[in-house]
Amino acid sequence: MMEVNTKNLTAAERVVLARKTERPSTRDYIEAVIDDFIPLAGDRNKGEDESILGGIGFFRGKPVTVIGHQKGNDLEENIKYRFGMPNPEGYRKAIRLMEQAEKFKRPVITFVDTPGAYPGIEAEAGGQGEAIAKSIATMSCLKVPTVSVFIGEGGSGGALAIGVADKMIMLENSIFSILSPEGFASILWKDSSRWEEACEVMKLTAGDLLELGICDKVIEEGEGAHINKTHIFNSVEREIAKALGQLSGKKGEQLASERYKKLRNIGRDYGRD
């Protein structure tokens, strides 16, 4: 097989890669880097949403809480998980697991991979906006170490809900943006066919976000996460361990304070000379 290097790809090409069905999902990363994982279900309010996978397990021998968007590895699974777009129940489950993690002083590891929260009428009627807002507020105030790993798409508030962490790690071909490039082009230019141009303007790649100070670490993929799976799993485990090591000696109040300052400083110097 011919070797392909993804270092010099355009932003649009990275968006295509971020969306590939063959990329490892949250479930794959959990199986690779978390031992004795026990999934936990339900939001204790309305029901269960399998597009948010969460539970407890051990990372290098230490107990952790893990939460992530779950996409499918084929069309049937993608329909089941709504292509990784959670309902309010999913975000309320995430909130429940975060609060539980803080109670038992477990670090929180999240895997982000979603086009955005599910935009259905039932989801909106069920309080989608409130659930996302509360998830962001809960995660941003946690007094335990938090690490987010962006493994594919990071779309809008649906990604932000479990992505406001102390340390943000991105795979080289993952993305994070306020909305999809197609949506951006449709709204600003009334022409969704200009989505590739939008990709460049939006600064949504891991490299862009590292340069802007939003992302803390970019993991190189080589030929792509869907090809070099073992390499990617090892790299992700190593970077999570490094991030948790940097956070482990800090007290809860210090973690929350530093996280607040980090989030408040995002964009403060953007556009200045």
Where are these regions (language model features)?
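Terminal-region recognition feature
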Residues: 1-186, 190-193, 200-273
